Design a protein with these regions (language model features):
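Conserved P-loop/Walker A NTP-binding site and adjacent catalytic elements of P-loop NTPases
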Residues: 2-192
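Alpha-helical transmembrane helix bundles of large polytopic membrane transport and channel proteins
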Residues: 191-201
């Protein structure tokens, strides 16, 4: 059973629309992206490639394992590009879905610009890092380049903490799905002496 934000987001995503999904941690952003990417690449976008962009190598490895599990059900191959293995190139060449950091994908495009030509769908996870002074510029330039070269490519931006979701959605020409729903109640606590009091948020 889908969480409410997932149920709201999936029809938009599966229809091929660009989407900015701004919902709390653990409310199901990644599953929406995984289902959309696997479904569309196995159907409407057959023959195209999906790119799943994350900010950190550790997160790339995690998403790679998750996407492999879902994508294997529809016969799609997933590749990982984080620059740590000499054997990566063969899996990159054969992949239907490529999981990578923005820096690695930017480097790959500089070395082989033709990689951009078959992109059908892009997921940008932890999208609030667009505002990070060290990582943001690379991601922004990368997405601008993809949007310029592949105008029809679908873009899904995911974030739990982005502060200006409406403005970003407008920049991406994307549907904005914004919710504060959580699967569990969030509490804050105050400790005065030995007295601990919890308050729901």
């Amino acid at each position: 059973r889908l969480f409410p934000p997932q149920a709201e987001a999936l029809p938009h995503a599966l229809s091929g629309k660009n989407m900015m999904l701004a919902i709390p941690t653990a409310s199901g952003k990644s599953l929406v992206a995984h289902i959309t990417m696997a479904h569309r690449l196995a159907n409407e976008l057959k023959g195209s490639r999906g790119v799943y962009i994350v900010p950190l190598k550790a997160l790339a490895s995690e998403k790679y394992e998750e996407l492999k599990e879902i994508s294997s059900c529809v016969g799609l191959k997933v590749g990982l590009a984080i620059g740590d293995r000499g054997s990566e190139m063969s899996s990159i060449e054969d992949s239907d879905i490529l999981v990578c950091t923005s820096e690695k994908f930017d480097s790959m495009l500089r070395g082989r610009a033709s990689l951009i030509e078959d992109i059908g769908i892009v997921v940008a996870d932890e999208f609030h890092l667009l505002q990070d002074p060290s990582r943001g510029p690379t991601l922004e330039i990368l997405l601008s380049r993809i949007r310029h070269k592949r105008e029809d490519a679908q873009l899904l931006a995911l974030s739990a903490t982005v502060g200006n979701a409406k403005e970003i959605a407008e920049w991406l020409e994307a549907e904005l799905i914004c919710s504060d729903w959580r699967p569990v109640t969030l509490y804050s606590g105050t400790l005065t002496g030995l007295d601990l009091r919890y308050h729901s948020i």
